[in-house]
Amino acid sequence: MVYISNGQVLDSRSQSPWRLSLITDFFWGIAEFVVLFFKTLLQQDVKKGRGYRNSSDSRYDDGRGPPGNPPRRMGRISHLHGPSPPPMAGGUGR
C-alpha cells in the first residue's frame, strides 16, 4: 500500500512487517487494554463521578431503605375466586 510520510510517497512493501515500532505499539496496546479492563472491573462507580445517576441509585440515599409491606387486611378474602367458567359448547343434547 502506498502512503505519504514527511511529504514523500512511500511503499509499505519496502519496510519489514515486523519493524520495532509495530512490535512496541502492539505491546502498549495490549498493556492499555489489560489496565482498562481491570479498572472497569474494580471501579464500579465510574458513572457517579461524572454526574450520571441511575434512577434506582437515588431513591433511598438517606438510609431509610425501601418502604415496608402494607398492613394485612383482616376478614374474608373474596378476590381469590376467578370468573365463572364459560358455558359448555355444543348444546345438541347428545
From Swiss-Prot:
Recorded GO cellular component terms are:
endoplasmic reticulum; endoplasmic reticulum membrane; Golgi apparatus; plasma membrane
User: What Pfam families is this protein classified in?
Assistant: SelK_SelG
Membrane topology reported for the UniProt record: Single-pass membrane protein
- Per the UniProt entry, what is one GO biological process? protein palmitoylation
Region Disordered, as annotated, extends over 47-94
Residues that span the membrane, as ranges: 20-42
As for PTM, the annotation reads: Cleaved by CAPN2/m-calpain in resting macrophages but not in activated macrophages. Macrophage activation up-regulates expression of the calpain inhibitor CAST/calpastatin, resulting in inhibition of CAPN2 activity. Truncated SELENOK proteins produced by failed UGA/Sec decoding are ubiquitinated by the CRL2(KLHDC2) complex, which recognizes the diglycine (Gly-Gly) at the C-terminus of truncated SELENOK proteins.
Role played:
Required for Ca(2+) flux in immune cells and plays a role in T-cell proliferation and in T-cell and neutrophil migration. Involved in endoplasmic reticulum-associated degradation (ERAD) of soluble glycosylated proteins. Required for palmitoylation and cell surface expression of CD36 and involved in macrophage uptake of low-density lipoprotein and in foam cell formation. Together with ZDHHC6, required for palmitoylation of ITPR1 in immune cells, leading to regulate ITPR1 stability and function. Plays a role in protection of cells from ER stress-induced apoptosis.
What family, per the record? Belongs to the selenoprotein K family.
Q: How does it assemble?
A: Interacts with DERL1, DERL2, DERL3 and SELENOS. The SELENOK-SELENOS complex interacts with VCP. Interacts with ZDHHC6.
By what name is this protein known?
A: Selenoprotein K
Q: Which gene encodes it?
A: SELENOK
